[in-house]
């Protein structure tokens, strides 16, 4: 039997709104997926197609999240680590080894390594990067459907000029990260 290696990555540390989303993926070495790379290097159409293929072909995968409230309470780094723990612990099997994109590891009891630029180096991290990105983008599309005036489908919650203009006109929703400086500053003005 081969070792079960999980790849983990996060999406959404920089946006002003929504969850930070992480994914853990254990790929099937007998069922390879072509075209895996860092999700940021792929078109949206290709990401969505690959995310579907990953969900179908991976041995196991799971999403972990931390809410805006948790981000505000813990800070973005600790909330991201919490979301990663949730992603891995939510897998139906315990991985033998975990590779995490970046330079930090969560405080957990898994044999693991942090890999800088891991989403370009290891297929399992690339797969995690892709399904986390598609999951978070879908969150923003749903939010856009509820609040089209903010154009969440366009800026995905990131601090763009158009996003700040929408906040100035329509206000700050509950899904905003109130500890993030631009949001905090706007709340203090009120």
Swiss-Prot record:
The entry's localization annotation reads: Cytoplasm
Gene3D superfamilies documented for this protein: Ribonuclease H-like superfamily/Ribonuclease H
Q: Which domain of life is it from?
A: Bacteria
The RNase H type-2 domain is annotated at 3-190
Lineage here is: Bacteria, Pseudomonadati, Pseudomonadota, Gammaproteobacteria, Alteromonadales
**Stretches of the chain forming a coiled coil according to its record:** none
Per UniProt, the enzyme's principal EC class comes to: hydrolase
Co-factor(s): Mn(2+); Mg(2+)
User: What role does this protein play?
Assistant: Endonuclease that specifically degrades the RNA of RNA-DNA hybrids.
Q: Which InterPro entries match?
A: RNase_HII, RNase_HII/HIII, RNase_HII/HIII_dom, RNaseH-like_sf, RNaseH_sf
Which Pfam families has this protein been placed in? RNase_HII (PF01351)
Q: Which GO terms describe its biological process?
A: DNA replication, removal of RNA primer; mismatch repair
Question: What is this protein's record name?
Answer: Ribonuclease HII
Q: Which organism is it from?
A: Alteromonas mediterranea (strain DSM 17117 / CIP 110805 / LMG 28347 / Deep ecotype)
User: What Enzyme Commission number(s) appear in the record?
Assistant: 3.1.26.4
- Alphabetic keyword roster: Cytoplasm, Endonuclease, Hydrolase, Manganese, Metal-binding, Nuclease
Q: Which GO terms describe its cellular component?
A: cytoplasm; ribonuclease H2 complex
Q: How is the cofactor bound?
A: Manganese or magnesium. Binds 1 divalent metal ion per monomer in the absence of substrate. May bind a second metal ion after substrate binding.
Q: From the UniProt record, which GO molecular function terms apply?
A: manganese ion binding; RNA binding; RNA-DNA hybrid ribonuclease activity
Q: What is its main location?
A: cytoplasm
| Reaction(s) catalysed by this chain's protein | Endonucleolytic cleavage to 5'-phosphomonoester
The entry assigns this protein to a family as follows: Belongs to the RNase HII family.
Residues annotated for a divalent metal cation binding in this entry: 9-10, 101
